[in-house]
Amino acid sequence: NPSILWEHRFNDRLSSSFNVEYLYTTGRYKFSYTKKNGYDTTEVRRNGDVRALRAEGGLFGLVRNGEWKAKVYFYNSERGYPGASVRQEPGRFRHEDRQWDDNFFVQGSFRKTFSPFYSLLLNGKYAYDYLHYLSDPRLDESTMYVNNHYYQQETYLSAANEFTFFKWWKANLAADFQWNTL
């Protein structure tokens, strides 16, 4: 399962981080049924494979009296769901269900102190998620047909203001916005 991480500091005010990872397994492994005085049957687990790719990157910066951050993330996978193993009927319930996932988001943050009396924090995020689940009786007679697709999008924005009247007296004013579909 390879993974690559690259981090770089461009200068005193800008740096980055990027990471990519790939995961794969066949999910085929031997297992044995046990009984009181030993092993009875050995089978091979099927449809337990997983394939996944994850990538993310970030930029980080400094501004006078503040900082900003930006990040992007992507994940894609496909996997099988292994079915039941029944000793009396080995291999009958093959269970060929599959699931596919896609996840993506981008987010950012900005914080700055404009004066000894006022500072600001802004945050934002957009996310997109997709899930596809398939159970097909043409591949596995023990299941009913299911072909589900789920889509979700989300946006989030936040602003926080801080006012400093005295060292012992501060006031905050914040607002959030969230939009979500499923």
Language model features: what each stretch is:
Residues 1-4, 18-24, 70-76, 122-128, ...:
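Transmembrane beta-barrel strands of outer-membrane/channel proteins
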Residues 1-36, 42, 54-62, 69:
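Predominantly transmembrane beta-strands of Gram-negative outer membrane beta-barrel pores used
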Residues 3, 17, 54-56, 103-109, ...:
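Membrane-embedded beta-strand positions in outer-membrane beta-barrel channels/transporters
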Residues 11-13, 23, 63-66, 113-117, ...:
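Outer-membrane beta-barrel channels and translocator barrels
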Residues 21, 61-67, 107-109, 154-156, ...:
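A general secondary-structure boundary signal
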Residues 27-29, 42-52, 66-120, 124-153:
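Flexible loop and strand-edge segments within Gram-negative outer membrane beta-barrel domains
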Residues 56-63, 67, 73-79, 177, ...:
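An exposure/low-complexity boundary signal
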Residues 118, 123-125, 154, 162-182:
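Exposed, low-structure sequence patches enriched in small/polar residues
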